[in-house]
């Protein structure tokens, strides 16, 4: 029993195990089938997605799509991180710049600035040619011969400086002679070579650290202190104040400013009354003279008012008794004023302000002290900064080696300026010299104001001698016999009171450079005298006589002695000037011009011109011009032009021309043009043309075109064409065309063509065509073509065509063209043209042109032209063109053409075309064609076409064609899914079934049979076991 139980237990265990295995197998197969369905569903989804995106049937693209998406996500993340890093980096300079800006502002606020300040700098260059200034331009009211020292002399003196240099000067006393020229005036100040890099320009070059001091003595005018009176400054009327100067003042070239004043004196003014003129601290009224005076205000030979300078540098005028007897007194006053070297120590912008009472004038000028003269390692500059005409003394300050270069065995000499009648006395008795050492070149003031307490006095360590009459010599005795820092030499000398000449000095620095070459550099100093003036007048006051004591008594009438010493001056000046001038010029010009002009001109001109011009021009012009011109011109032109032009032109031209032209041309052209054109053209043309052309063309064209064309053409054509063409073309075209065409064509054509073409085409076309064509055609064609074509085209065409064509054409053409063009054009043209043309032309053209043109043109032209032309043309053209064109054209053309053409062309074309075409065609065609064609074509075309065609065709055709076409049909089935299924799947938005399979019933049946078979086997084994028992 136990054994049986055990056996039953074993059998039952075994049966349960078999059932479990079968059930597990069924479940496993079911799960496996479910996974396979999911995988199939995913595969189908990926295939359709890939097909929708790339329109490709390549199975590899199915698996590549998800990888591409993952890669894009990764790239996007990387780009984001990179941009974040760049943003962080970019913020640091901004923060630094903000800090620097704040620091700069803080520094600027410490310097007081008044008025409008403009930062500008000029400088003379460090070359001998530039530093040698001629110091021309005469001062107004210059008195170079006056040497009076009387108390009434109001002349002020300013210094004039100029550098000189020479080489290989063996004799120390030998110097270069430079002729004296007139000193520069205020408005025409001398050397004007400019270089901001050599100028230490500051916004306000005013020394505010030291108290204001005057370099002149006020003792001479203290005795003229006014009598006690009242200040009537604010009672003056009709007050005018002006500052007259150029934008730049050169103090070391006798530069100064004019202070102009005008006013009316109240009738109540009496002797002793005063008024005050404020003078800015940046100016002084003495120049280099030690004693400052201001001019009296004169009324004829009478003094109206006397002026003195107070301790603040302002001017106080005191009225004389002239105002006691005059009414309506008016006065004007002009005073020269000079830049104060103590208060303006550096080159820079300075705002000047002066006034009478509440009426003031302000002006900002650039004070340019100019750079020292330099020749190789030698540098020097000097100035005469003080003249005492009472004591007959002067002071000269010289900067030796201000550049801080290394000068070996330096020697400084001072003499009278050659070829001048200088009044200086140079000897041991009349000349005292002090020498100061400067540790740092930046410690030197550009105005040559020197405070001796700030520098080391080394006078005792140098050797000062007077080797020749009117000459001193300073030898710098250093331990190594060379200097590397600047030195200041101050010369206090005397002038000869009996001399008729002016003060003129020359200072020369000698020394070796590191190559032991002996050179010299000189600097000349002179003075210029400037006068101030004051004038006024008035009307005599009425006098009330004494009344008689008794009635009837009559006072005797005095003789009339009315005296009016007032001075009125008026000047009328007329000038007639005739001038002849000849000019050869090379010009770089940048101009902005607006011009309205009406011009009648007859001109004959011969001109050779080389011109570089950048021009922006707005011009409205109406011009009638008869011009005969011979011109040889080489021109590089970048031109941006907006032009509105109305032109009526009648021209009759007979021209015989032989032309050989070599031209290099690169052209970038942007053109906007609106064009309406009515053209009637009769043309007889005999043309022989040999053309070699390489053309690469990128063309974007939007064209709306309506065309009515009646064409009768007789053409005989023999064409040998080798064509390589690379063309990228995107074209949107709306075309309405009515065409009647009759064509008789005899054509022999040998064509070898390699063509790569990418074309997208959408075309809408309505075409009515009646065509009678007789064509005999022999054609041998070898064609390799890769074509991708997208095209958008809307076309309505009615065509009646009669054509007889005889054509011989040999053409070699290489063309690269990028064209952007917007064209609106209105044109009426009647043209009769007979042209025989032979042309040889080599043309390279570089042109960058942006043109917006609105043009209305009426042109009647009769032209007879015989032309021989050979043309080799390499043309690179970038062109964008938007063209709206309405054209009515009646054309009758007889053309005999021999043409050899080799053409390389690459074409990418996008075209959408909807075409409605009604065509009646009767064609007789005999065609022999040998064609070898290799073509790779990717073409996407949306075409809506309505075509009504009546065609009668008799065709005899012999054709040998070898074709190698690699074209993948767009609708070929793949992976058991045909195009219709794909379309249905694409249009259906419902999700795929969970199983992803269509043989669901078959699978269930198979597994049911397997289960039944397992059950039979199980029951059979049980039965066998029972039988064994």
From Swiss-Prot:
This is Clumping factor A. It comes from Staphylococcus aureus (strain MRSA252). Residues 40-63, 89-105, 133-142, 163-200, 973-982 have a biased composition (Polar residues). The keyword Signal applies. Residues 1-39 form the signal peptide. Coiled coil: none annotated. Cell surface-associated protein implicated in virulence. Promotes bacterial attachment exclusively to the gamma-chain of human fibrinogen. Induces formation of bacterial clumps. Keywords: Cell wall, Peptidoglycan-anchor, Secreted, Signal, Virulence. GO terms for biological process: cell adhesion. A motif (LPXTG sorting signal) lies at residues 992-996. Its main location: secreted. The modification Pentaglycyl murein peptidoglycan amidated threonine is found at residue 995.
